[in-house]
Amino acid sequence: MVDLKTKAFDISQNFTISLDGPAASGKGTIGLILAKKFSLKYFQSSIVYRQLAFDCISQKIDVTDIDAVIALSKELKLDNNFDLENENIGNIASQIAVISEIRNNLNKYLISLVKTTPRMIMEGRDIGTVVAPDADLKIFITANPQIRAERRYKQLQAKGKTCILDEILRQIILRDKRDKERKAAPLLPASDALIIDTSKLSAMEVVEEVTNYIKNKIT
């Protein structure tokens, strides 16, 4: 049996990391650094939900028309021809993500992607519990909602986007509530996940903690 350290550092080995956590917890930045460090393909699972949200908007489908959205989810094609960080798209994506039929349809795509990619880190909300329960390493990132709102606010400001901190915080709290209370795969860490609170940690400090965990993990 190949140990975790060998899988992580030997690029000839298959190696899968699941990276879960709430919105604006720092998953994206951390995931990209880990992907580069361990030669992994990085995939943000929220893209499929945002793509579906964008398709609903562009095709003028009301997200309350559940049957229409479910039908659309069966025909999803990724083109990434939209602003991934658009808050309106993100909020719609969060609304449709609570529908179990939609999650099932989109998860089929994600599961297939994990199974056919030798070295991957997939980021999302239920990767370690649903999409890749057999991942070699499961990480769950969390942080205080206020800290997360401030981070998102700074990110948007740096890109020249107009935003209001209180509104970002309100949306984060609302999204957390949806994610945790949905019946289909609620936001929870896997029982064997490495849980890291990033409230007082930089992305590099988190990566260092993960690296040390890999080096010292006894299979």
Curated annotation (Swiss-Prot):
Name of the molecule in the record: Cytidylate kinase
Predominant location: cytoplasm
InterPro entries hit by this protein: Cytidylate_kin, Cytidylate_kinase_dom, P-loop_NTPase
Signal peptide positions on this chain: none
Localization: Cytoplasm
A Pfam family this chain is assigned to: Cytidylate_kin
Domain of life the protein comes from: Bacteria
Binding site for ATP: G21, P22, A23, A24, S25, G26, K27, G28, T29
Family of this protein: Belongs to the cytidylate kinase family. Type 1 subfamily.
GO CC aspect terms: cytoplasm
Molecular functions (GO terms): ATP binding; CMP kinase activity; dCMP kinase activity
GO biological process: pyrimidine nucleotide metabolic process
Underlying gene: cmk
Assigned keywords, A-Z: ATP-binding, Cytoplasm, Kinase, Nucleotide-binding, Transferase
Organism: Rickettsia conorii (strain ATCC VR-613 / Malish 7)
Reaction equation(s) it catalyzes: CMP + ATP = CDP + ADP; dCMP + ATP = dCDP + ADP
Enzyme class (EC, first level): transferase
EC number of this enzyme: 2.7.4.25
